[in-house]
Amino acid sequence: MSGTGVLLLTLLLLVAMAASDMLSSLIQAHERDSEESCKSYGGGPCPSGEDCCCPPGRSTGTCKRTCNNGSVCA
């Protein structure tokens, strides 16, 4: 195999490893959400750094670091 082929193969391997690490980090960040049940108006508080995220029109939700599809319970 030529030197260029070896270099390209090595570069491809490094890119694949970096992509795998990024995907693993994203999965771990998602799993760090506590997923504890919470309620607005006197429900259990969420851990520090998390909000109580409720689906639209609901007063019960789950604790998450970011409310993607819902909104922070009032």
Curated annotation (Swiss-Prot):
PTM description: May contain 4 disulfide bonds.
Record keywords: Disulfide bond, Neurotoxin, Secreted, Signal, Toxin
Endpoints of the signal sequence: 1-19
Tissues of expression: Expressed by the venom duct.
Primary site of residence: secreted
Gene Ontology terms, MF aspect: toxin activity
Disulfide bonds: none
Compartments reported by the entry: Secreted
Functional summary from the UniProt entry: Probable neurotoxin.
Entry text on domains: The cysteine framework is C-C-CCC-C-C-C.
Protein name: Conotoxin Cal27
